[in-house]
Amino acid sequence: MYFDTHAHLDDERYDQDREELIARMKQEGIGPCLTVGANMDMNRMAVALAQRHEGYLYAAVGIHPHDVGELNDATMEQLRAWVRLPCVKAWGEIGLDYFYDRAPRDAQKEAFMRQLEAAREENMPVILHIRDAHGDALDLLRQRRGNLPRGVVHCYSGSWESAQEYLSLGFDI
């Protein structure tokens, strides 16, 4: 049986047939599955799906670099509450995305560090989304060397040298 480590079953394109899709996944031997949030609405849906399909679906919650405008004290409090639920297994996806540059880079860095620290405090692994920003991401992670949560850099497209550095910091690719 496969374990899908990164799905977006909360995506609106599945609104018409989400439950049928999940049933087909089970029939085809896919699962369990981690459905990954990226903003507060998606996080809410990911948690609801994981609760509805307990033992088969799990959730990851976090604020994606495109949506860092949503991150404030209230959303951080809600994210912390969610990661304490048994169905939530990771904090993410979080990181830096300079490819689309949909949010100011300084705001992305601040949100990344804030969530990284919270994940460490909550002993949650992280799912890192780093796109065209490996230099800045590695600089920020190096500053916290020895004080980082475990995690994975998903959908990796950087250099071999950057991959080796993420690995040396304790992350999986």
Residue ranges and their predicted role:
Residues M1-I173:
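Mid-domain alpha/beta scaffold segments of enzyme catalytic cores
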